[in-house]
């Protein structure tokens, strides 16, 4: 497909750019992705864009996901899921253009039309880790969000910390544990963790939405926490517990050569209910389990520093589009970077869009800006 007509955000020969919204996926965060899609599909400006929702079943099958977007929302504690279908969606090049094709057994394939930009709302492995980005790069299809390398680094908490440290950003003490290390010499791992001091947080290195994370207060609970994390990823990161307030900042790519834009920082407060930290249920299931204060009640100089460091973290991993950067603000005023999320939760109640709303950029406008950035960013080396 020729991209020369897309730089204005309005391709010639058709009144509206066509946006394929991808969600679901093969990871344990499948349901979170569906909930994110419900928010985006409900808010995207359909007068401006021709929107095609495409669900990815847990098997990896791509299906056309039409109908009421409410089907992807949380219903109580029931988690939504993309069901497999006899009809399969593929992205193919036909006549020099990228077309979505729907095919079913014993039926003639149907063309859904040219895709101008893909909005991948995929969380976790096989989506947020550079894999879907690599597929879209190979097909020369523009897409929202970070590229292959930034997505991969942002997914791996170990290499993320290595990159941050090399950029001079302050990260907390941690131990990275591979499958081989744990299988070969678990006692050596226990000694490393014991030197960190307790409590510690045991995390899968390449999972999000707080999946598989445990807080461990003593050596006795370590093995069980490690095995729980290994259910999600055989590579782990074990972090020393840090006394501090949880501060977040939303980052949005600048236009052209402009610097990344940052929101007012927000503070996460977990309101008990059995939650020792900001876990999956507090994030997505229980409406009153956590709250966001934005702007965070910290000194003005700390707010400025959070925004500066968030932009630096965005640049350090080479992010594009959007990211959320999380910090600990310690009692002595130090800021310790916890992580960057290159595809943060994007439901209307998620912290990323909430912080932008508090900063003057509404949910629908934020979606529009991300699509604009993607339409005006070429694939390939940049």
UniProtKB/Swiss-Prot annotation:
UniProt-annotated binding residues for Mg(2+) 2: 339, 341
Biological processes annotated in GO: cell wall organization; peptidoglycan biosynthetic process; regulation of cell shape
An example Gene Ontology molecular-function term: ATP binding
DNA damage is among the record's keywords: no
The keyword Ion transport is annotated on this UniProt entry: no
Cofactor(s) listed: Mg(2+); Mn(2+)
Reactions catalysed: 2 D-alanine + ATP = D-alanyl-D-alanine + ADP + phosphate + H(+)
Gene Ontology terms: cellular component: cytosol
Amino acids binding ATP: 193-248
Subcellular location: Cytoplasm
Keyword tags: ATP-binding, Cell shape, Cell wall biogenesis/degradation, Cytoplasm, Ligase, Magnesium, Manganese, Metal-binding, Nucleotide-binding, Peptidoglycan synthesis
Cofactor-binding details, from the entry: Binds 2 magnesium or manganese ions per subunit.
Binding site for Mg(2+) 1: 326, 339
Principal EC category: ligase
Record-annotated ATP-grasp domain positions: 161-372
Pfam family, one: Dala_Dala_lig_C
EC number: 6.3.2.4
Pathway the protein acts in: Cell wall biogenesis; peptidoglycan biosynthesis
Main location, first listed in the record: cytoplasm
NCBIfam families found in the cross-reference section: D_ala_D_alaTIGR, PRK01966.1-4
Stated role: Cell wall formation.
Protein family: Belongs to the D-alanine--D-alanine ligase family.
Protein name per Swiss-Prot or TrEMBL: D-alanine--D-alanine ligase
Lineage: Bacteria, Bacillati, Actinomycetota, Actinomycetes, Micrococcales
